[in-house]
Amino acid sequence: MPKMKTHRGAAKRFKKTGTGKLKRGHAYTSHLFANKTQKQKRKLRKATLVSPGDFKRIRQLLDNLK
C-alpha cells in the first residue's frame, strides 16, 4: 500500500502548536474592508484554534505533518 500523503492545501492553511492543537487564520480578510468596522478588522488579524468539531477531520488531512 502506498504512503499516506499530506493534503498540501490544508498544510498551507494550518499550523500545529506545541501542544498538538491546530492554529488557523480567520476568513473574511482578503477584501471588502470598507464595510467592516475597525474592531472587526482588528479581531480578524489574530490567529485562532481549530474548533473541536473540525479537529478530527482536519487532523486526517495533516496526518504526516510535523
From Swiss-Prot:
Q: Where are the transmembrane segments?
A: none
Residue span of the signal peptide, if any?
Answer: none
- Report if keyword Iron is assigned: no
Record keywords, A-Z: Ribonucleoprotein, Ribosomal protein
Q: Which Pfam families match?
A: Ribosomal_L35p
Does the keyword section mention Ribonucleoprotein? yes
GO BP, sorted A to Z: translation
Any one cellular-component term (Gene Ontology): cytosolic large ribosomal subunit
Supply the PROSITE patterns for this chain. RIBOSOMAL_L35 (PS00936)
- The region called Disordered is annotated at 1-48
| Gene Ontology molecular functions | structural constituent of ribosome
Query: Biased-composition ranges for Basic residues?
Result: 1-26
The record, for InterPro entries, names: Ribosomal_bL35 (IPR001706), Ribosomal_bL35-like (IPR021137), Ribosomal_bL35_CS (IPR018265), Ribosomal_bL35_sf (IPR037229)
Question: Which PANTHER family does the entry mention?
Answer: 54S RIBOSOMAL PROTEIN BL35M, LARGE RIBOSOMAL SUBUNIT PROTEIN BL35M
Q: What family is this?
A: Belongs to the bacterial ribosomal protein bL35 family.
- Name by which UniProt lists this protein: Large ribosomal subunit protein bL35
Q: Which organism is it from?
A: Geobacillus sp. (strain WCH70)
Print the organism lineage.
Bacteria, Bacillati, Bacillota, Bacilli, Bacillales
